[in-house]
């Protein structure tokens, strides 16, 4: 039913605007937390980084950042659920012979995957850390951009699995490889 589909699309649109607004607020809270951690440090031409560890999560102000993220994460979960409902509705249309929706389904699937990955990485940084990852917040030299980062602690098994075991030949070039 087209009316039901429109309702789902409107709900997802409203939720996406809510995620956007809450994300902006989250980064404002995070920016204030970072500013407090940088207190007294001179400006630099280099990016500034704060490693997020258990001790970081006990610092004053972190609770506010974490509560703000909880709102973002909850709303993002609702949005992902709405997008999944739309994806299923598009699947029903495709099954009924409307081939024109297949591109939209592919785009929506990719969007949902990327949003899910971003939510999982951000939740790990905020309050569900993995022992296999390292987390940090980075501020660019001019201080106008914050980025959340996560990276594996042990890359050897990943390189072995995805490169050495999968490829017949591998050429790696880097200024840091010796």
Language-model regions: role of each:
Residues 1-178:
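ASCE RecA-like P-loop NTPase motor cores
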